[in-house]
Structure formats: structure tokens, C-alpha cells
Design a protein with these regions (language model features):
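General small-molecule cofactor/ligand-binding pocket signal
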Residues: 11, 99-101, 112-114
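A short, polar/proline- and glycine-enriched secondary-structure boundary/capping micro-motif
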Residues: 23-25, 59-65, 141-146
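Amphipathic coiled-coil/heptad-repeat helices and related helical stalk/stem segments
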Residues: 34, 58-61, 85, 117, ...
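Active-site metal-binding motif and surrounding structural segment of the metallo-beta-lactamase
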Residues: 56-105
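Active-site-adjacent helix-turn-beta-strand microarchitecture at beta-sheet edges
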Residues: 109
Length: 202
């Protein structure tokens, strides 16, 4: 089970997305790296999976995940940042009898949600680790750092935002003491992430 430990009880893993295709034009709807990230957080009273996608070695991964969850003995919660990231949520929810609600009242202690108005996304905040977990609206920038998603990623919305409007909608995230941003697309920012976030939203 190839987990990258971000902090005590906080892990990230990457897996190739089955719908990825090479040669995408920059700024297009397919402009993202082949591997996408998922997060495992051992919250005080639950084990939380965010946007989980099983890797190609799924059976061995599941065996190790079974062991980890059994050892913890906590309920499992699976959270989805955006509809496109349902990924293997339903299979894992059945396997672990997990909650999939992201309503604020149902979130486990240690997890907060920040719906991005009109953007179809909920970004999760893990205060213990000062970590943000976005879906498609904040992504890794080539060469490091962060950027907002391309305009093309917003076209499907009923009332599409401009990039300027999207940045404004995410402005309140800068009020958080962010140290890490665990993006799904691209490389996570694990230090000085507030500076990177501020630059992305400028």
C-alpha cells in the first residue's frame, strides 16, 4: 500500500485515472496529469477517505486498507469534493458501510467543509494538519505551486463563473492558517502553502 505520509494520521496516494488521455491541449477539459490524488485521514472518531481512486494493484491495496481500518476500529466516512470525483466511492462505501454525506452536520470531528459558491465543489479543511483538500478548482501548477482550474473546466456549470469570479469565491480560504494543500490534480504543496494559494487566487 503505497501511501505518502503527510503528517501523523494523514496520508495521500496517487493512482492513474482510467479516463485520462495523452496529448491534451493546454487549458482544455482534459488538461490534467494522468495520476490523481486521494487522501486518507485518521480523524479522532472516524477514518476519512477523500476522493478515493483505487490503484491498478487494487486487490493488494484493498487488503492493506482492510487491515488499517480494522486496526483503527473507527467508522469510515467517504467525502467527495466534486461530482466528477466519485471514483471508487460507491464500491468502498459498500465494503466499509461508510457514510458518504458531506452535510456539515454529518462531518466527523476534525473535518470542515467549504462549499465554493456556484462552482459545484466542496473543499475540505483538516485543521489538525492545516491542510486543504480541493477537487478541481485548485490544482497543482507545472513546476510546483498552485493554480485555479482552466476556464474550460467551468463551462458545464448551469451558470458558469469566470476565472475572476472563481478566485473571488475562494478568497475566504485565505483566512485559514493553511500550511498544506493536497490537490487531486498535480503535486501537493506541503510547505508554505498559504503563499502558493494567495498567488493562485491573486
Amino acid at each position: 500500500m503505497d501511501l505518502q505520509q503527510i503528517g501523523p494520521g494523514l496520508f495521500r496516494w496517487a493512482a492513474p485515472h482510467p479516463e485520462w488521455s495523452p496529448g491534451a491541449s493546454p487549458g482544455s477539459t482534459a488538461d490534467w496529469p494522468q495520476e490523481v490524488g486521494s487522501v486518507l485521514y485518521e480523524a479522532p472518531h472516524a477514518t476519512v477517505l477523500i476522493d478515493p481512486l483505487l490503484p491498478p494493484e487494487r486487490e493488494s491495496f484493498l487488503r492493506e486498507l482492510d487491515k488499517r481500518l480494522h486496526r483503527r476500529g473507527r467508522p469510515v466516512t467517504i467525502l467527495t469534493t466534486i461530482g466528477f470525483h466519485r471514483r471508487d466511492r460507491d464500491e468502498l462505501a459498500r465494503r466499509y458501510e461508510a457514510s458518504t454525506s458531506r452535510a456539515k452536520k454529518n462531518l466527523p470531528a476534525g473535518v470542515e467543509s467549504f462549499p465554493v459558491r456556484r462552482a459545484g465543489e466542496t473543499i475540505f479543511w483538516l485543521p489538525e494538519h492545516r491542510a486543504l483538500v480541493p477537487g478541481d478548482r485548485i490544482i497543482g501548477s507545472p513546476g510546483g505551486g498552485l493554480r485555479v482550474c482552466p476556464q474550460s473546466w467551468l463551462r458545464y456549470l448551469p451558470n458558469p463563473l469566470t476565472i475572476a469570479q472563481l478566485k473571488q469565491a475562494m478568497g475566504p480560504l485565505l483566512e485559514l492558517p493553511v500550511e498544506r494543500v493536497l490537490v487531486s490534480h498535480g503535486e501537493p504543496v506541503l510547505a508554505d502553502a498559504r503563499r502558493a494559494l494567495s498567488a493562485a487566487l491573486a
